[in-house]
Amino acid sequence: MGTPWRKRKGITQVGTMSPAIALAFLPLVVTLLVRYRHYFRLLVGTVLLRSLRDCLSGLRIEERAFSYVLTHALPGDPGHILTTLDHWSSHCEYLSHMGPVKGQILMRLVEEKAPACVLELGTYCGYSTLLIAQALPPGGRLLTVERDPRTAAVAEKLIRLAGFDEHMVELIVGSSEEVIPCLRTQYQLSRADLVLLIHRPRCYLRDLQLLEAHALLPAGATVLADHVLFPGAPRFLQYAKSCGRYRCRLYHTGLPDFPAIKDGIAQLTYAGPG
């Protein structure tokens, strides 16, 4: 009879100690939540709430955003469409888009460089595509690549709603890894004066090296890469700084609607194969 009693006693002691241990860790948990509250809000908004709304509505966030644009934006006015998307992201659901601060950097560079041909890798909902298209010089051409067909369908409708036709903005559905080797033969792109990398940062280095390997970057070409600090593209940045073929500049920004989360855009100027 004694042994079972001791076991029960041991279990009782462990049970009474667990809340005490949890209480001891409470200050640490609170400190971490306060320090990383912006990341926690981002996680809740982009993963938990978004997944719930996807299930309830049967639509993806990009499709819900486009429905909002249809009822609130002026067709044929890309600036008003962009402002409407910004309002949606700030007041309705967070949209993982470039946002107005980074957008101004992008538009200024497109206007300064006046590229004849721009290649965008990562169309997403079409936000940055509209930024580039409205800043292109007369006769300029934009090829934008999106790997997800459903997202690409939304972007296509947004681009056409803004008033840009297929001759000015061509959307290609496929992964950057598959599309880049085919650009010269299938899409008559012999050079990209400006390239925007705005999809998975872990793929940026691969994409850059593919562009080099297929001789699609002329000397003086500009390569812009978003999200190089968050979530980050350290291998891409290290390569660009150490290979000797690029001049690098980093624009420090925050995430749209989360300015406390630090991010940045890298601007590379290609010097040539060397």
UniProtKB/Swiss-Prot annotation:
Its EC number is 2.1.1.6. The keyword Methyltransferase applies. GO terms for cellular component: apical part of cell; cytoplasm; endoplasmic reticulum; membrane. Gene3D superfamilies: Vaccinia Virus protein VP39 (3.40.50.150). Belongs to the class I-like SAM-binding methyltransferase superfamily. Cation-dependent O-methyltransferase family. Catalyzes the O-methylation, and thereby the inactivation, of catecholamine neurotransmitters and catechol hormones. Required for auditory function. Component of the cochlear hair cell's mechanotransduction (MET) machinery. Involved in the assembly of the asymmetric tip-link MET complex. Required for transportation of TMC1 and TMC2 proteins into the mechanically sensitive stereocilia of the hair cells. The function in MET is independent of the enzymatic activity. Interacts with LHFPL5, PCDH15, TMC1, TMC2 and TMIE. Interacts directly with TMC1. The interaction of TOMT with TMC1 and TMC2 is required for the transportation of TMC1/2 into the stereocilia of hair cells. This is Transmembrane O-methyltransferase.
